[in-house]
Amino acid sequence: MSKRDYYEVLGVAKTASESELKVAFRKLAMVHHPDRNPGDKEAEIKFKEVNEAYQCLSDGQKRAAYDRFGHAAFSQGGAGGPGFGNEFGDFMSDIFENFFGDGRAAPGGGAGRGRGGAPGRERGSDLRYNLEISLEEAFAGKTETIRIPTSIACETCSGTGAKAGSKPRTCSTCGGYGRVRAAQGFFAIERTCPNCHGRGEVVDDPCTACSGAGRVNRERTLSINVPAGVDDGLRIRLAGEGESGMRGGTAGDLYVFLSIKPHPFFQRDGADLFCRVPISMVTAALSGEITVPVIDGSQTQVRIPAGTQTGKQFRIKSKGMPVLRSREVGDLYIQVSVETPQNLTKRQRELLQEFDQSASDENHPESAGFFSKVRDFFVSGATRA
């Protein structure tokens, strides 16, 4: 049975670059991998075909020979067929470690290697801390001292987990790699070592201070710089302030999630602040000045023109929130609400009634216009009927 063209197998053009070949191979290898298609002989055949095509075309000399002579270049007496060396095994390990997680399959043999560097090293876990601050603190910025429970390297054993005077020994099952491989036909299935649980080392005489864990629980005190202008939901990352790593692994990170308490006066939209201020009917009708609060703790005056209605908005420039890591500042918007007087005395009622009797449509243009439209609507409706 004749072999398919290698370029056709990978679905690339004959001018494909090395990176294009690699992308095509990764995609097809994941689709046809036997772990994703258990018991599917056709998938296994296609997977082998994809491997063979890539091994040829990814090698400069073999690709040149293939481009010139085709499959005949690798027949008996030719340049030699595509093989599966250690470099390919490492490349496949990288692919399937990302895709399949702890249990992976890769062509070829060889011992496994930890992703984080030397075998057995384990990165510390990331930590999360929720911090609630006031809007005033978000405006000015602050330094907050927090206390967090975490795990740190055991000082007694320096994080090795072994008792003083002893040290961990290399795992005899995996040879210190933390993983073992079992050959299954064409493939080698790689899994975490059952003896050392991926550490690559075995502690025979554990440290009494940490019970062999290499870490102990402690509470740490940290200072967090909260910059001015932070918004609700912002995340601050403190690199290396998470849990300590295991057996020389790097520490995790600390993520501080900010939330801002609701404010009694201000609502926030980005860098702008909004404040609803009640004004008297007289001030709204005759004009006047009102005093309004500012987020920095000061106050400012706002001139209310005669005839101001509920919902009228006044803008005060640069009295809002600072923009994070910028010199820009938002604005403060004052929205007035005309308050209708309550609990009137007899004399106050009489004065309002006198005003109402003397008022004309010019004094209430919106009301007059609205009811005029309503009247016209019903009159025209009756005419159509």
UniProtKB/Swiss-Prot annotation:
J domain location: 5-70
Disulfide-bond pairs as recorded: none
Any single GO CC term annotated in Swiss-Prot or TrEMBL for this entry: cytoplasm
Cofactor: how and how many bound: Binds 2 Zn(2+) ions per monomer.
Zinc fingers classed as CR-type: ranges: 141-219
SMART domains cross-referenced by the UniProt entry: DnaJ
Keywords noted in UniProt: Chaperone, Cytoplasm, DNA replication, Metal-binding, Repeat, Stress response, Zinc, Zinc-finger
MF (Gene Ontology): ATP binding; heat shock protein binding; unfolded protein binding; zinc ion binding
Binding residues for Zn(2+) 1: C154, C157, C207, C210
Stored InterPro entries: DnaJ, DnaJ_C, DnaJ_domain, DnaJ_domain_CS, HSP40/DnaJ_pept-bd, HSP_DnaJ_Cys-rich_dom, HSP_DnaJ_Cys-rich_dom_sf, J_dom_sf
Xref: SUPFAM superfamilies: Chaperone J-domain (SSF46565), DnaJ/Hsp40 cysteine-rich domain (SSF57938), HSP40/DnaJ peptide-binding domain (SSF49493)
Quaternary structure, from the entry: Homodimer.
Description of its domains: The J domain is necessary and sufficient to stimulate DnaK ATPase activity. Zinc center 1 plays an important role in the autonomous, DnaK-independent chaperone activity of DnaJ. Zinc center 2 is essential for interaction with DnaK and for DnaJ activity.
Name of the featured protein: Chaperone protein DnaJ
Organism: Methylorubrum extorquens (strain CM4 / NCIMB 13688) (Methylobacterium extorquens)
